[in-house]
Regions:
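Nucleotidyltransferase catalytic core that binds NTPs
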Residues: 1-147
Length: 147
């Protein structure tokens, strides 16, 4: 059975993430790798839920086989998660996949991530979960503005 890596901020997690995880789990055993608090602070200025909280929520989702933590995302890419995923699962005879959400295409993801996957024998998959239906940032902005 294939093993699938799915990365993201997941801050906060929402139904769009769950839908993408469900679709990714249909491809194989799903390993989810949430980004660090530091990565979120760089990208968005702050984080809403600390990593430990996000990990606990993700672990409880029925589609998730395991959660990958403590990977280096300081370069702004998922290459650290891809490397750790490969180190953990390369010995299996299973096909390794890197799932990208519905808002990701070969044209708007880091070429480093795609090249890194290919160099390790991991197949990148795009448009997992279909078109983006929600955004964590929009969700939080709407909440802030409703006050």
């Amino acid at each position: 059975m294939p093993i699938v890596l799915f990365t993201g901020g997941f801050d906060p997690i929402h139904s769009g993430h769950i839908n993408a995880m469900e679709q990714a789990s249909n491809l194989g055993k799903l390993i989810v790798a949430p980004n660090s608090d530091e990565w979120l602070a760089k990208k968005k200025g702050s984080f809403f839920q600390p990593l430990e909280e996000r990990v606990n929520i993700i672990r409880s989702i029925k589609y998730v086989y395991d959660v990958l933590t403590n990977w280096d995302d300081s370069d702004g890419t998922a290459c650290g998660a891809i490397t750790k995923f490969h180190e953990l699962y390369e010995r299996s005879d299973d096909l390794l996949l890197f799932a990208n959400g519905g808002d990701r295409t070969p044209n708007n993801v880091s070429t480093f991530e795609i090249e890194h996957c290919i160099s390790l024998g991991i197949m990148p998959i795009f448009n997992v979960g279909g078109a983006k239906t929600q955004s964590s940032s929009t969700f939080l902005n709407d909440w802030k503005n409703a006050k």
